């Protein structure tokens, strides 16, 4: 509070506190007239009291302007501290400030003020010296001259009278030069403030000098222009420039405007600093996952030194050193065990995302670069989350069906393209990956790598050197298995080697190149031990996704998925997409399913379910994170405890025969589980479980397992803390107290509290540093305490580094057992998949299939597996009887919406389920080993390739004719409908004849061309049979109604009843009536033609009975049936 003149006697010096003066103390009112000044000076003390009531008139030496602080002590304002900013403090403005502070405290004469709100403007004109000369008081005159002189210099300093623009200019030019970010307050100044240069504060271009932090960011950004950088600055992570704009858009955070470009573009020369956005440190991975999921490449730039170690080092005055420590994309994000998936999509019925594979592709022999060339393709697909590697090398035709099949099977989230692709392949890749609505469920990131003419030789050398160095580092260069391993890699096809070399280089950038050391998990895609399901088959039969909204619900995988673990679900997905061809392996698998569902094994099966139910984490991903060295301490504890729990569950099992199951698959899988128990217990004995659960790095290891570095720094910390305790007696002696007790306030330790009495404060030495205080006490640090705390902080930082180093060594030791741990997890995944299939088999109406070496499909009362689960009503079952030696093909006719497509899909799905090793929805099933299922269903064009619907239809058919074998199942739906009736019938008849006579595949041919039914007569032994979907008719004319029975019957449906579908589609009634009349007229015309043809044949037979052979009579019967 401001004291009145009657209370203006100065207090004792001991109770006075100096308080900083604000900038407002330099403001003055407008200069008064000479007469008024003279009168005011004569008034003396009254004017002093009036001036004291106006805070903006307070001066540095005004004795009357006293205030009370929170302690109740009387304080006096201290003179303002002013930076020199390049001005000589002895000769310039700094000296005047010093002199002004030493002016005697005397009453000030009042100055005139405006009658409006701008009471405290600077005077626009200089002081009137004449008015000062008229005063009779020499002391007042001297004081006023000093004040006016100070006022002139201050106004000049501000840049002009009545102007505050200079203050703003100084703030914008000085702040960036001294600190990295004054606004954020995240970090102390990394370099001392730079004095302002004389003259203009900014360059001619505009904008200020770059801060050390901005220089670091620009230097890193120039090396990674395609990466969004997240930079650690103190206690936040920050984005700069264009990265800040993208982050603000994707993360919904605030972007502070500024420069967007990193190239000093003239259009941004007027801006002083970069645009920026920030996120808290503990939310880093949450936001990184969101950016990576959006398709961006994200880099994390971290500080490589801590504040304590930096303060003790030689570079204490330099900016913090920073480095790009992590790079992330969709496929390489392994820092979170949940990955980018979150909840299991298949289980929730949500969208089916990409599988996490990164696929590298390259081409050769792409001559012509048109749409019809043949190319040789090599691919390598890597799944960093699990360590799986798939490779393949193949030729492909102009439709690129082989490439499409592999892309749909693997479903990559990232593509690495080596060299240029042909136009057809490029268009296919863009079609499959260029939209969020594609078959992968999300947009796919695409990176491109240049391909030299000598790429094959260079790639071979690079791969050889890579594996040779790894084997040498592992000291296994002379081992026979290691040599065989190296030879296996070097024997890969040329184009696969090119892709492998590119992927090694690509993943090295992300620190994940170690995955290629796990060559045990290299798999060839085109292994002939599995049924081939090409791209069209995956889509048409809805193996992984439905065709409505591309989600997993309603797919075959969704139907069979009853797994309890993530790694079990991934293995089941592989089983679904790659059914077995090996009859022995298949029988072993289905026998295991049968044993799990049998009542005699209920107890053992429940024991397995309980064991799998205890697994709450994704062990497969956990293990690969341990292998990469990215596992956290609580995660490691969870993994080891989970492995210990499941290993102890079957600790009594020594051999497969001890498992309680007769199935070899079940016995071997269970016997492999307890084999890891010894290693797991050994690693757990090194860990302090309580500390690991709380992520306490300092106490993570048990005392007996701590390294020398950890023990040394812990002793150092204990020694410093002991010295701090000993220092209490020294502090007590200085204060003349019996004893001193340390206190902690706001997280600051080792504070000494002293009462705010005059006697107590006198005893506090000047070297003690006041840290905080209240009205009653003040808290101090002694110089010795400050020095000891600095030593303790250095020991703590070094201890943290030693703990991290020891933890990394433990992870490397565990990683040396990766193979055995991975085999155990793979056994658990197998058990999970078999239990899932057993749950399916336990449903009513499912039967164990019988396998035969003969190519056949004999199913009694079969049902569609997905439709049956989705529909509330019961599904109408149907039989199927196909045999390579008897009826190889069925010609399926029937009304629209009569169930033709569902029937043929049902047959294909039952065959696939049987070769997965699952029970099938039927009364009985006997199936041969099919090597492939091909489908040509649906109608769509390919505008990107300039292909019409009919062109796409025939191209896909041509691919089927090239790949199909006598052991394949082929489904052709309404071939030939994309052109005129005559051409369509001709093409359909030719294709059907070729399939039955030449390829001899099992064929299901759906058509609305009744004329094709005559072909059945031309094949002996009923190789081609006519079947139709049954229905009943009622009414006639416009009241005609049709009822679908969804049952398969022998013979041909001579009408398609398209008008019935038109009625269901709610076409206008007048339109339907016109269509019905036209249809009746056309049918009558065709019937008359057939009747005329029949009469002509009968007449010819009467004239020449010799024509009456078997084929002639069959034709007569067929024509009569069509009437």
From Swiss-Prot:
One Pfam family hit: MutS_V
Annotated compartments: Nucleus
Compositional bias per record (Basic residues), positions renumbered to this chain: 197-207
Main subcellular localisation: nucleus
One GO location term (cellular component): nucleus
Stated family: Belongs to the DNA mismatch repair MutS family. MSH3 subfamily.
Protein name: DNA mismatch repair protein msh3
The species this protein was found in: Aspergillus fumigatus (strain ATCC MYA-4609 / CBS 101355 / FGSC A1100 / Af293)
């Amino acid at each position: 509070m401001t004291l009145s003149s009657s209370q203006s006697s100065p207090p004792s010096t001991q109770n006075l506190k100096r308080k900083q003066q604000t900038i407002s103390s330099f403001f003055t009112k407008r200069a008064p007239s000479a007469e008024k000044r003279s009168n005011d000076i004569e008034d003396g003390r009254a004017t002093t009291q009036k001036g004291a009531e106006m805070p903006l008139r307070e001066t540095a030496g005004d004795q009357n302007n006293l205030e009370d602080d929170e302690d109740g002590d009387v304080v006096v304002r201290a003179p303002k501290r002013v930076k020199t900013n390049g001005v000589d403090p002895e000769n310039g403005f700094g000296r005047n400030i010093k002199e002004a502070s030493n002016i005697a405290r005397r009453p000030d004469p009042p100055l005139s003020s405006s009658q409006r709100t701008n009471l405290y403007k600077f005077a626009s004109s200089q002081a009137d010296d004449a008015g000062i000369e008229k005063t009779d008081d020499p002391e007042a005159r001297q004081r006023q001259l000093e004040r006016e002189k100070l006022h002139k210099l201050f106004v000049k300093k501000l840049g002009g009278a009545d102007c505050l623009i200079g203050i703003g200019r100084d703030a914008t030019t000085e702040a960036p030069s001294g600190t990295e970010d004054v606004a954020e307050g995240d970090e102390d100044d990394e370099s001392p403030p730079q004095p302002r240069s004389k003259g203009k504060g900014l360059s001619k271009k505009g904008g200020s000098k770059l801060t050390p932090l901005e220089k670091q960011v620009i230097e890193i950004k120039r090396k990674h222009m395609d990466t969004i950088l997240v930079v650690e600055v103190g206690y936040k992570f920050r984005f700069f420039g264009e990265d800040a704009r993208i982050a603000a858009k994707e993360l919904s955070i605030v972007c502070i405007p500024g420069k967007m470009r990193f190239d000093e573009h003239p259009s941004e020369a007027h801006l002083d600093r970069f645009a920026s956005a920030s996120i808290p440190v503990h939310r880093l991975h949450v936001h990184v996952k969101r950016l990576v999921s959006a398709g961006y490449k994200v880099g994390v730039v971290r500080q490589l030194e801590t504040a304590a170690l930096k303060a003790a080092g030689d570079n204490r005055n330099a900016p913090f050193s920073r480095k790009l420590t992590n790079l992330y994309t969709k496929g390489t994000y392994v820092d979170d065990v949940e990955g980018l998936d979150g909840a299991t999509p298949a289980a929730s019925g949500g969208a089916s995302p990409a599988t996490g594979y990164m696929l590298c592709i390259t081409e050769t022999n792409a001559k012509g670069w048109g749409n019809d060339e043949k190319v040789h393709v090599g691919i390598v697909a890597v799944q960093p989350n699990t360590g799986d590697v798939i490779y393949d090398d193949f030729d492909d035709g102009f439709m690129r069906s082989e490439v499409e099949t592999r892309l749909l099977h693997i479903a990559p989230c990232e593509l690495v393209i080596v060299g240029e692709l042909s136009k057809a392949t490029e268009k296919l890749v863009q079609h499959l990956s260029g939209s969020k609505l594609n078959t992968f469920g999300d947009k796919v990131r695409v990176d491109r790598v240049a391909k030299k003419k000598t790429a094959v030789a260079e790639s071979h050398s690079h791969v050889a050197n890579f594996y040779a160095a790894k084997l040498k580092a592992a000291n296994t260069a002379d081992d026979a298995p290691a040599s065989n391993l190296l030879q296996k890699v070097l024997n890969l096809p040329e184009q696969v080697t090119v892709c492998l070399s590119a992927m090694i280089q690509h993943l090295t950038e992300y620190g994940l190149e170690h995955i290629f050391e796990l060559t045990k998990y290299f798999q060839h895609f085109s292994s002939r031990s599995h049924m081939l399901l090409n791209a069209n088959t995956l889509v048409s039969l809805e193996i992984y996704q439905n065709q409505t909204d591309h989600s997993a619900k309603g797919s075959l995988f969704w139907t069979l998925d009853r797994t309890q673990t993530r790694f079990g679900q991934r293995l089941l997905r592989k089983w679904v997409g790659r059914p077995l061809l090996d009859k022995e392996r298949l029988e072993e698998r289905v026998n295991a399913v049968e044993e799990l569902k049998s009542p005699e094994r209920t107890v053992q099966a429940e024991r397995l379910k309980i064991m799998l139910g205890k697994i709450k984490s994704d062990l497969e991903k956990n293990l690969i994170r341990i292998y990469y060295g990215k596992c956290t301490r609580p995660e490691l504890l969870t993994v080891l405890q989970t492995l210990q729990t499941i290993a102890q569950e079957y600790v009594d099992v020594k051999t497969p025969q001890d498992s309680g199951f007769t199935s070899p698959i079940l016995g071997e899988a269970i016997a492999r589980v307890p084999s890891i128990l010894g290693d797991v217990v050994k690693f757990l004995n090194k860990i302090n479980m309580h500390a690991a659960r709380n992520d306490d790095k300092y106490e993570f290891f048990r005392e007996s397992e701590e390294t020398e570095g950890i023990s040394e720094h812990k002793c150092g910390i204990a020694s410093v803390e002991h010295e701090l305790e000993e220092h209490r007696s020294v502090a007590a002696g200085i204060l003349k107290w019996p004893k001193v007790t340390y206190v902690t306030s706001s997280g600051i330790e080792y504070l000494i509290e002293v009462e705010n009495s005059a006697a107590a404060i006198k005893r506090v030495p000047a070297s003690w540093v006041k840290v905080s205080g209240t009205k009653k006490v003040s808290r101090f640090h002694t110089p010795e305490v400050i020095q000891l705390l600095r030593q303790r902080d250095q020991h703590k930082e070094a201890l943290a580094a030693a703990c991290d180093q020891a933890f990394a060594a433990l992870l490397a030791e565990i990683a040396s057992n990766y193979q055995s741990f991975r085999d155990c997890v793979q056994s658990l995944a197998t058990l999970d998949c078999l239990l899932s299939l057993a749950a399916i088999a336990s449903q009513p109406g499912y039967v164990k299939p019988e396998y035969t070496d003969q190519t056949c499909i004999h199913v009694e009362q079969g049902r569609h597996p997905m439709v049956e689960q989705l529909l509330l009503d019961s599904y109408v079952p149907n039989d199927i009887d196909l045999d390579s030696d008897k009826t190889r093909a069925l010609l399926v006719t029937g009304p629209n919406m009569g169930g033709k497509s569902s029937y043929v899909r049902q047959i294909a799905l039952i065959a696939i389920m049987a070769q997965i090793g699952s029970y099938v929805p039927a009364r009985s099933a006997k199936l041969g080993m099919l090597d492939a299922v091909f489908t040509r269903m649906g109608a769509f064009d390919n505008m990107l390739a300039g292909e019409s619907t009919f062109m796409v239809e025939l191209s896909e058919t041509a691919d089927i004719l090239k790949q199909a074998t006598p052991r394949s199942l082929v489904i052709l739906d309404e071939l030939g409908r994309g052109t005129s009736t005559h051409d369509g019938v001709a093409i359909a008849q030719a294709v059907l004849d070729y399939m039955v006579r030449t390829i001899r595949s099992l064929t299901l041919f759906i058509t609305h061309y009744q004329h094709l039914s005559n072909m059945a007569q031309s094949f002996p032994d009923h190789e081609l049979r006519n079947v139709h979907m049954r229905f009943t008719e009622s009414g006639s004319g416009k009241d005609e109604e049709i009822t679908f029975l969804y049952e398969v019957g022998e013979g041909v449906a001579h009408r398609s009843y398209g008008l019935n579908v038109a009625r269901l589609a709610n076409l206008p009634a007048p339109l339907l009536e016109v269509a019905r009349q036209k249809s009746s007229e056309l049918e009558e015309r065709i019937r008359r033609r057939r009747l005329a043809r029949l009469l002509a044949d009968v007449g010819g037979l009467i004239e020449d009975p010799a024509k009456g052979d078997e084929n002639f009579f069959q034709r007569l019967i067929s024509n009569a049936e069509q009437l």
